[in-house]
Amino acid sequence: MTRDQKFALVTGCGKGGIGEALILEYTRRGIYAIATVLPTENSDHLTAAGITWFPLDVTDEQSVVDLKKSIASVTDGYLDFLVNNAGICYTMTAIDTDVSAVKRMFDVNVFGPMRMVHHFHDMLIQATGTIVNIGSIGGVVPYMYGASYNASKAALHHYSNTLRLEMSPFNVKVLTVISGEVGTNILKNDVHRNLPEGSYYSPLAVEFRDHVQRTPKTTSRFEYAENVVAQSLKSSPAAWFWTGSATGIIRFLDMFAWRTIWDFFFYREFNLGKVKDAYLANLKKDM
């Protein structure tokens, strides 16, 4: 049976983020795109755009179960595109990491997509659909202050690799997006974060504050969404699709350069020599 209408489900469609841009792009291309937002999150921007939306907390099993029932009633049991976009960030040095905060982040960034795939896989198989997992260059390179976030995205990348293999008997495709820096508000919860008192990285306290409050050179989220949606609509999408600011050079160096090239680059960019000098000076004081 041929279906004229295709359906997409995009998680994490809060105002100003990648999800909002993705949902609008799928809609523009004639896909019936369904958005999710957190139960506590404002959804006026979706209602105003005529987008069907449902509340979802990807860390809550029952919330995912309830969403599936709602989606199935709209799509008659089919789902052509599942876009696991919901994600949060945690910026901190590895040695100063608050593990409870990291557990929360992994629950969203890693276990969230796992829950979605677990509950929606039958609808995707029914539609011979595509799973789109939104990864990051952070899962490829050791970007400073991002050890925990980078680890969550690396975990998602490797989960996606195996998922791609395991879904192949059912002709369900899995697209992993390696995102560069994109203009979103994902850092909004980090702007007031400081290094803890007494941290070995205290010499970089000012630089750390500047980092979490930075406005990096980024790709427009709408340009990004256009590229991702176009790739997901292909009959044979890439296994890994690199798009966004800085992805070209990072992809090249990751393929052809030695593994520690990033140590050389980031040591200088983030002024780690200042930390070393302070550490050595303290050692001399104690002698």
UniProtKB/Swiss-Prot annotation:
Q: For binding NADP(+), which residues are annotated in this chain's numbering?
A: 10, 36, 57, 85, 149, 153, 182, 184
Answer whether the UniProt record assigns the keyword Oxidoreductase to this protein: yes
Query: What top-level branch of life does the organism fall under?
Result: Eukaryota
Single Gene Ontology BP term?
Answer: triglyceride catabolic process
What is any Pfam family matched here? adh_short
Where does this protein act, in terms of pathway? Secondary metabolite biosynthesis
- Which residues does the entry assign to the active site, renumbered to this chain? 149 (proton acceptor), 153 (lowers pka of active site tyr)
> Might you report a single GO cellular component term?
lipid droplet
For this UniProt record, the keywords arranged alphabetically read as follows: NADP, Oxidoreductase
GO molecular function (one)? acylglycerone-phosphate reductase (NADP+) activity
| Keyword Secreted found | no
Per its UniProt record, what InterPro entries does this chain match?
NAD(P)-bd_dom_sf (IPR036291), Sc_DH/Rdtase_CS (IPR020904), SDR_fam (IPR002347)
* EC numbers: 1.1.1.-
Q: Which family does it belong to?
A: Belongs to the short-chain dehydrogenases/reductases (SDR) family.
**Known role:** Short-chain dehydrogenase; part of the gene cluster that mediates the biosynthesis of virensols and trichoxide, fungal natural products that contain or are derived from a salicylaldehyde core. The pathway begins with the synthesis of the reduced chain in virensol C by the highly reducing polyketide synthase virA via condensation of one acetate and 8 malonate units. VirA has interesting programming rules since the first 2 ketides are fully reduced, the 3 following ketides undergo beta-dehydration, and the last 3 ketides are only reduced to beta-hydroxys to yield the trihydroxy portion.
This protein's name: Short-chain dehydrogenase virD
